[in-house]
Amino acid sequence: MTDSKPDALTYADAGVDIDAGNALVDRIKPAAAATNRAGVMAGLGGFGALFDLKAAGYDDPVLVAATDGVGTKLKIAIDTGNFDTIGVDLVAMCVNDLVCQGAEPLFFLDYFATGKLDVDDAARIVEGIAAGCKASGCALIGGETAEMPGMYAPGDFDLAGFSVGAMERGRALPDGVAEGDVLLGLASDGVHSNGYSLVRRVVERSGLAWDAPAPFAQSSLGEALLAPTRLYVQPALAAIRAGGVHALAHITGGGLTENIPRVLPDGLGVDIDLSSWSLPPVFGWLAQEGALDQAELLKTFNAGLGMVLVVSADAVDGLTWTLEDAGESVHRIGTVTAGAGVRYSGSLG
């Protein structure tokens, strides 16, 4: 009688391709290297990444950390096969938060998880991450690619980002917000990266395919809704350096209604004139197709303003010039007032 043994198994037989992971690292190294900045001490491949705060120019730094994802916007990227800019979204969601604390983003790490690694698709995503980092002056110093068979449906993946920034001690924001301060809104580049569960429901109701012409843009519907989140880091840092900025609010989930109060002291609120900027066409279409009322738009989406600065009244003109010089479209949208809450006048349009 002959003993028989089953064929020997490998990790690849279980669905994990280490060679593909190594190929991805080799593919993305040039993109990551292009993000290097003062303070970076080593390239990709170590067990941890090193960063020298003194070499980055800091004397007495306070570190600020942020983490985020891009939500179900990923589903549109997956459904359309368009992975070129979703990485920019990932970076923006983190670094735009950091700058609201007054911090300069220093470095970034990403987490990419999927059931089966497609090197080409993953490389496009990470190259987008690197592009967002480079535009923000932030180094891509590491990350994790997790191939986990059975955890994700075929073709699905998830992303998370982690970023660390710094400011000198005593310069953290918000600081000094007072009654009479002015709100300056910076235009968004579309829906950005929140509210996409509602967006996808509206698209489903409309009956339009992702490759159909967008009713509100000169592109396909999928391309229009994948427009990446605007990176506000460099303009915001320029404004902070100019002086007079008391707070910044990144307008993400919760919209203007919930994000502005996060940077206000107890007892203060804001009066906002909704007619002081134009509602971008994408939001008009979403409102019409989804029968969304104004309150729903304002608490779900950015409604055309991706960042709001709270500034001294006497600094408005100078800061407006600084921000416009950095490429931003600036709108004076309201003031800080006594009494907690966000009070709207006028209407979106």
Curated annotation (Swiss-Prot):
Keywords: ATP-binding, Cytoplasm, Ligase, Nucleotide-binding, Purine biosynthesis. One of its GO terms (cellular component) is cytosol. Its EC number is 6.3.3.1. One of its GO terms (molecular function) is phosphoribosylamine-glycine ligase activity. It catalyses: 2-formamido-N(1)-(5-O-phospho-beta-D-ribosyl)acetamidine + ATP = 5-amino-1-(5-phospho-beta-D-ribosyl)imidazole + ADP + phosphate + H(+). CDD domains: PurM. It comes from the Bacteria. The keyword Nucleotidyltransferase does not apply. It holds the Pfam family AIRS_C. It is found in: Cytoplasm. Its main location: cytoplasm. The keyword Transferase does not apply. Pathway: Purine metabolism; IMP biosynthesis via de novo pathway; 5-amino-1-(5-phospho-D-ribosyl)imidazole from N(2)-formyl-N(1)-(5-phospho-D-ribosyl)glycinamide: step 2/2. SUPFAM superfamilies: PurM C-terminal domain-like, PurM N-terminal domain-like. Disulfide bonds: none annotated. GO terms for biological process: 'de novo' IMP biosynthetic process; adenine biosynthetic process. Belongs to the AIR synthase family. HAMAP family: AIRS. This is Phosphoribosylformylglycinamidine cyclo-ligase. It comes from Jannaschia sp. (strain CCS1). The gene is purM.
